[in-house]
Amino acid sequence: MLMRRKNIKIEFRYDGSSYYGFQRQPNKITVQGEIEKVLRIVTKEEINLISAGRTDRGVHANHQVSNFYTSSNIPIEKYKYLLTRALPNDIDILSVEEVDENFNARHNAKMREYIYIISWEKNPFEARYCKFVKEKIVAEKLEKIFSDFIGVHDFKNFRLSDCVSKVTVREIYQIEVKYFGENKIKIYIKGSAFLKSQVRIMVGTALEIYYGRLLENHIRLMLNDFTKEYKKNLVEAEGLYLNKIEY
């Protein structure tokens, strides 16, 4: 009997500290690889996740969305239990549902939000989850620097050299810098999509301007001048989180 092919959407979160990024890599432990491994065992099929975002090594996710196709007859309500039981504790399945066969977690996403956390109080138990700086950051001053990113721009200068994306134009919808407790800020960056390490280079560049190590117009130069190679000011991965996906 031929089983009907189903399109399954899963929403999940993870601590990226122990993984070589999200995307599957040969002989490396990745988030995608761990989930696909469990799904192959459960469904007895070859599974390929289609995902909204591909985070770097050490980057976390509060909300990630993937979908996959399967002809397995496993009841949809059992997937969450089976995945949760088999996956490591640093990957948490939030929901599993069957969706329209045309749904694509990557291409249908309308907005992706990242957050970056910075702390000026050193804490060894938070070393994997934020960036430490020596002095308090003035949120309003940093947010003003980030405003140059808002809108549609070519982010060719805000990606690593191994980025394979042919289209480098992206739209940034909103950037907010908010205090979080007494010793932290969270930088919220909303956009259509992002290039490899784009957010980390954006944050790193803004911080260099904030500390006076780059001129105030440096972001505008990088967004408009493609005649030379600019230094990539890349902040640590540990403070970055894929926070929200909207469709």
Curated annotation (Swiss-Prot):
Q: Which GO terms fall under molecular function for this chain's record?
A: pseudouridine synthase activity; RNA binding; tRNA pseudouridine(38-40) synthase activity
Any Gene Ontology biological process: tRNA pseudouridine synthesis
Q: InterPro entries this protein is in?
A: PsdUridine_synth_cat_dom_sf (IPR020103), PsdUridine_synth_TruA (IPR001406), PsdUridine_synth_TruA_a/b_dom (IPR020097), PsdUridine_synth_TruA_C (IPR020095), TruA/RsuA/RluB/E/F_N (IPR020094)
The record, for CDD domains, names: PseudoU_synth_EcTruA
The catalytic residues are 56 (nucleophile)
Catalytic reactions on record = uridine(38/39/40) in tRNA = pseudouridine(38/39/40) in tRNA
PANTHER family from the xrefs? PSEUDOURIDYLATE SYNTHASE, TRNA PSEUDOURIDINE SYNTHASE-LIKE 1
The annotated subunit structure for this chain is: Homodimer.
**Function comment:** Formation of pseudouridine at positions 38, 39 and 40 in the anticodon stem and loop of transfer RNAs.
Q: Which family does it belong to?
A: Belongs to the tRNA pseudouridine synthase TruA family.
Q: What is this protein called?
A: tRNA pseudouridine synthase A
Q: Source species, please?
A: Fusobacterium nucleatum subsp. nucleatum (strain ATCC 25586 / DSM 15643 / BCRC 10681 / CIP 101130 / JCM 8532 / KCTC 2640 / LMG 13131 / VPI 4355)
